[in-house]
């Protein structure tokens, strides 16, 4: 079975009693107090990384509290597979990912490819990645079928804690039956991890004939 999904990181969100654009129905005379200035405090920001299953109209969102890195992105994909992918597609023989061309899953990032190789070896499944060309990230279906509805669902609600954010994401649904699961990823991911030429050479990557820099398949180590 060839399985296709879309993934991306939503923009970072402030955690705390800050203004969140939109309106919410409340009792008259009972407005919710928020801070005037949105200076980042000790709770910081979160980076929601989404995995959207086009076939099932289901999604997983890992809410990161650290840096939005390639390691974080691949960990979100790993968690999706453990929690949703493997139970839904037990006979899968390969995976296809459509991803943005930049960000934590950018096509230029060596760490993205190295971390994917580790995941491929764990799953013993080849993973094909198709990056959207530069300047076309809004073509990513995850923007229109997941992130836009998450934004609608929490509009007007201050994102006061990590758990509130996770709960609001998981409560997102649509008239077409979108189902979302979410979890906080409390791991700390280091910025600026370097991947040497020697490490990159261990990635069993086969570029496709059409724009191999954007389209490629990573196979389990030693299989090709």
Where are each of the predicted segments found?
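Extended hydrophobic secondary-structure segments that form protein cores and membrane-embedded regions
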Residues: 5-6, 94-101, 129-134, 168-169
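Short, conserved catalytic/metal-binding motifs centered on acidic residues
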Residues: 7-8, 57, 100, 140
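C-terminal His-loop and adjacent cap/lid subdomain of alpha/beta-hydrolase
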Residues: 27, 43, 68-75, 79, ...
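Electropositive, glycine- and tryptophan-enriched low-complexity nucleic-acid-binding patches
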Residues: 31-98, 102-103
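Two-metal-ion acidic nuclease core segments, chiefly of the RNase H-like superfamily
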Residues: 112-128
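C-terminal accessory extensions appended to soluble enzyme cores
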Residues: 156-224
